[in-house]
């Protein structure tokens, strides 16, 4: 039995604030939703279940019951999941606020116990203090939290009562314990005070549960990667040929400077929180999905589908436009891919083709060449530390000759105007040289790969990890989405 889930079910009848805060999806009707085949703790009801992705952050951290409430720990609506969320760094004041939250929402005193006795004693079998009927009173205050590590300084902690154990190797979070950052003896005293109000039959169960959960060791934090995010919220814009992501958040017009001000209103101005929850709107943000994680994933898929036979072919068109050649056709893959990746693939394959055919005697695209595996490796090594080594291996497979102690290759350029301009810009020359050394060859390859992507300025993870306040600010400034003109043609001569 999930104690936190039971506590939300019973305590929601205490106050007007509890009726809104403790209304979780796990205590309502189940709606069929696909799960992510990941077992873990649902952050909203704290029970172990099959997790599904959240519509707010695209990470699997809610169960199929709670996902219907559409709540995320990154919302700015002060629902219970948001109130249990604290951003790094953790301070003693923030931990004290979490303890005050438990005491306000889930109090244990004589008045509350008498009320639950009247509610529960409906038949003779419920007259005794059985755990089955009073499990919601066995809610100890612990400082365990599910930690999300987006970056070294971008961490979120969702506090809750995470009972039992489960292999969370595939979950995006790890359970950490902050009892040492607070005060172990002080937390014991707070729980002993709560326990003293319980009937004698329930005290041992409360104490056992508290000491088991409050002394748990912290797990090593897990770095969240792009592969942890679901593909269900990704939308491909067929007009701009760019991927985007739908982000849904609960947005309220009320603002708080930090968590401490929010918890202050929880204690002193409960009507403000009720008004914020009543006036919140479920808002959709459409954001671009241009980040380093997606770039690496797309490059890996491109290397898998790449057709290196193109470098030995006599096709006059771009590599992405070849459709009826079984050795060079890749159009099936590039039809729904970012146009920047498509342009990079065209220029890179055209450049290697011109260099290779200028130095090696080859036949046509059905030929078997030793350079083919290297071209796949070259694409896979883009934006990695192995890029220079792979470029040198590709260069050495083009039969370079030594001129005055420097290995060079010939370059007889084709009719690709985009490649012509790119080489001129990279080498900063007025006319294209017919001889290239390794440094020039490497500079051109790197320039083509980084033509549309500045890796240093790319975010590592999707926009769905941004807070709601950041998303609103970016939407108002127009930086939430990217708009590009369609690439109709590289040259007007292509249609002639």
Swiss-Prot record:
**Domain of life the protein comes from:** Viruses
For the motif pLxIS motif, what are the positions?
A: 486-489
Annotated consequence of substituting residue 489 to A: Does not affect ability to degrade host IRF3
According to its UniProt entry, the protein's GO biological process terms are: symbiont-mediated suppression of host cytoplasmic pattern recognition receptor signaling pathway via inhibition of IRF3 activity; symbiont-mediated suppression of host cytoplasmic pattern recognition receptor signaling pathway via inhibition of IRF7 activity
Mention one GO molecular function.
RNA binding
InterPro entries, per the entry: Rotavirus_NSP1 (IPR002148)
Q: Per the record, which residues fall in region Important for cytoskeleton localization? A: 82-177
UniProt keyword RNA-binding, yes or no: yes
> Per the record, what is the consequence of mutating residue 479 to I?
In strain: Isolate 5S
Chief place of localization? host cell
Q: Which family does it belong to?
A: Belongs to the rotavirus NSP1 family.
According to UniProt, the name of this protein is Non-structural protein 1
> Which lineage is the organism of this entry classified under, starting from the top rank?
Viruses, Riboviria, Orthornavirae, Duplornaviricota, Resentoviricetes
């Amino acid at each position: 039995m999930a104690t936190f889930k039971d506590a939300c079910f019973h305590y929601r009848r205490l106050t007007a604030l509890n009726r809104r805060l403790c209304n979780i999806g796990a205590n309502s009707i189940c709606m069929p939703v696909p799960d992510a085949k990941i077992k873990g703790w649902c952050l909203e009801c704290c029970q172990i279940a099959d997790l599904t992705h959240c519509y707010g952050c695209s990470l699997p951290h809610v169960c199929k019951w709670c996902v219907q409430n559409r709540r995320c720990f990154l919302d700015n609506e002060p629902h219970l999941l948001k109130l249990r969320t604290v951003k790094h760094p953790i301070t003693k004041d923030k931990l004290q606020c979490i303890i005050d939250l438990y005491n306000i929402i889930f109090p244990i005193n004589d008045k509350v116990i008498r009320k639950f006795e009247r509610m529960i004693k409906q038949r003779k079998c419920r007259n005794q203090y059985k755990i089955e009927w009073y499990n919601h009173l066995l809610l100890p205050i612990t400082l365990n939290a599910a930690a999300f590590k987006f970056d070294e300084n971008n961490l979120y902690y969702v506090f809750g009562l995470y009972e039992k154990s489960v292999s969370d190797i595939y979950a995006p979070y790890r359970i950490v314990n902050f009892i040492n950052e607070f005060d172990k003896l002080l937390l014991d005293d707070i729980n002993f005070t709560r326990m003293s109000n319980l009937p004698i039959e329930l005290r041992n169960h409360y104490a056992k549960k508290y000491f088991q959960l409050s002394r748990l060791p912290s797990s090593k934090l897990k770095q969240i990667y792009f592969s942890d995010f679901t593909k269900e919220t990704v939308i491909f814009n067929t007009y701009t040929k760019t991927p985007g992501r739908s982000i849904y958040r609960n947005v309220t017009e009320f603002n708080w400077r930090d968590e401490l001000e929010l918890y202050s209103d929880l204690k002193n101005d409960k009507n403000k929180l009720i008004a914020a929850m009543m006036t919140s709107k479920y808002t959709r943000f459409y954001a671009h999905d241009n980040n380093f994680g997606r770039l690496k994933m797309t490059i890996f898929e491109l290397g898998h589908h790449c057709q290196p036979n193109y470098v030995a072919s006599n096709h006059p068109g771009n590599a992405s436009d070849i459709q009826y050649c079984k050795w060079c056709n890749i159009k099936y893959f590039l039809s729904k891919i970012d146009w920047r990746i498509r342009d990079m693939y065209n220029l890179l394959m055209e450049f290697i083709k011109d260099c290779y055919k200028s130095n090696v005697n080859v036949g046509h695209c059905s030929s078997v060449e030793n350079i083919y595996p290297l071209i796949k490796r070259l694409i896979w090594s883009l934006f990695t530390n192995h890029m220079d080594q792979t470029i040198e291996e590709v260069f050495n497979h083009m039969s370079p000759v030594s001129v005055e102690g420097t290995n060079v290759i010939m370059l007889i350029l084709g009719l690709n105007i985009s490649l012509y301009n790119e080489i001129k810009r990279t080498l900063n020359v007025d006319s294209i040289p017919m001889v290239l050394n390794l440094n020039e060859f490497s500079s051109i390859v790197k320039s083509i790969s980084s033509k549309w992507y500045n890796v240093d300025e790319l975010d590592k993870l999707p926009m769905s990890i941004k807070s709601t306040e950041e998303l609103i600010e970016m939407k108002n400034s127009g930086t939430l989405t990217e708009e590009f003109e369609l690439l109709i043609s590289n040259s007007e001569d292509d249609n002639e």
